């Protein structure tokens, strides 16, 4: 099983507002950057999209260490998801889970991989986190300025 290191981030100019996401995948000394955005989104949606797109890009089962500065993503997938599924996509308080379609997509994308979800403090000097932060922010700016290609 291949070992892949993944770094993800999402960005939003306003919340909601133009959004961008980015992922850096590292395998055997090689790197691949992924990035995209939406004209109107939220920061949480962009954080989810970064993880989804990184995992959906992989064509075979992998051992992954996924670094995110989003507690929402890390806790959602590692702690909250089982309860949401048991309660038919309701929170502990009985409300519908926000971004359900993205959570379902992320859940599906995780099934064939072994993933170690790691939280990294954002804007704290981690070079890979800073790199994906810049990529995601540039995508959000491109969305805002009408320059987006994705």
UniProtKB/Swiss-Prot annotation:
- Alphabetical GO biological process terms: DNA replication, removal of RNA primer
**Entry cofactors:** Mg(2+)
Q: What is the lineage of its organism?
A: Bacteria, Pseudomonadati, Pseudomonadota, Gammaproteobacteria, Lysobacterales
Its keywords, alphabetically, are: Cytoplasm, Endonuclease, Hydrolase, Magnesium, Metal-binding, Nuclease
Q: What does this protein do?
A: Endonuclease that specifically degrades the RNA of RNA-DNA hybrids.
Q: How does it assemble?
A: Monomer.
Entry's PANTHER family? RIBONUCLEASE H1
Binding-site residues for Mg(2+) 2, renumbered to this chain: 9, 133
Q: Which InterPro entries match?
A: RNase_H, RNaseH-like_sf, RNaseH_domain, RNaseH_sf, RNaseHI
Q: Would I find Magnesium among this entry's keywords?
A: yes
Q: Which NCBIfam families match?
A: PRK00203.1
Major localisation? cytoplasm
Protein name as catalogued: Ribonuclease H
Q: Where does Mg(2+) 1 bind?
A: 9, 47, 69
CDD domains, per database record: RNase_HI_prokaryote_like
Per the record, the domain of life is Bacteria
- Identify the enzyme class: hydrolase
Residues spanning the signal sequence: none
Q: Which residues belong to any copy of the RNase H type-1 domain?
A: 1-141
């Amino acid at each position: 099983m291949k070992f892949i290191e993944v770094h993800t981030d999402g960005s939003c100019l306003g919340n909601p507002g133009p959004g961008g996401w980015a992922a850096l995948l590292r395998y055997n000394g090689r790197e691949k950057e992924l990035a995209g955005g939406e004209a109107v989104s939220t920061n949480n949606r962009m954080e989810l999209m970064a993880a989804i797109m990184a995992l959906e890009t992989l064509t075979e089962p992998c051992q992954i260490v996924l670094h995110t500065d989003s507690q929402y993503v890390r806790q959602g997938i590692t702690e909250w998801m089982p309860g949401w599924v048991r309660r038919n996509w309701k929170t502990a308080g009985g409300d519908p889970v926000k971004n359900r379609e993205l959570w379902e997509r992320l859940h599906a994308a995780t099934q064939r991989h072994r993933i170690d979800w790691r939280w990294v403090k954002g804007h704290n000097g981690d070079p890979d986190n800073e790199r994906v932060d810049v990529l995601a922010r540039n995508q959000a700016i491109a969305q805002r300025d009408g320059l987006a290609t994705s």
